[in-house]
């Protein structure tokens, strides 16, 4: 797989996989689950998956956590189905979940939706990468 995708692409994908695994694992904690961190790691999975796609296609991208922006940049070589654009919802979790502030806590339902969206992005990126081989 390294030969097919390249080392950098695999590094981005591995980091994305670690983020989603951590998000899923947090849901199994017997103590109070930090849903904001579940949502944060889901956002990170989606972001890193999209960046892996851009690295694979040798497309420069800005330093950003904005999923909408990354989807737009990725749309040059790939056409995404409409459900992928729902992942724009994840952008808010990139910063607001990491620092104290006025924002409301993330609910279990919101955390589960964040995981589902991140998994959709990760799976779709993997399918697109496989098509490119």
Predicted regions and their residues:
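Terminal alpha-helical segments
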Residues: 1-133
């Amino acid at each position: 797989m390294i030969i097919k995708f390249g080392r950098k692409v695999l590094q981005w994908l591995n980091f994305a996989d670690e983020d989603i695994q951590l998000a899923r694992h947090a849901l199994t904690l017997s103590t109070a689950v930090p849903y904001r961190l579940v949502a944060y790691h889901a956002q990170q999975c989606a972001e890193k998956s999209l960046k892996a796609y851009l690295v694979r296609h040798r497309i420069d991208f800005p330093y950003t956590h904005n999923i909408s922006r990354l989807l737009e940049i990725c749309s040059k070589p790939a056409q995404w189905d409409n459900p992928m654009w729902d992942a724009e919802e994840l952008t808010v979790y990139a910063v607001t979940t990491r620092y104290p502030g006025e924002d409301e806590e993330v609910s279990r339902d919101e955390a589960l939706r964040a995981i589902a969206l991140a998994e959709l992005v990760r799976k779709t990126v993997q399918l697109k990468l496989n098509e490119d081989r």
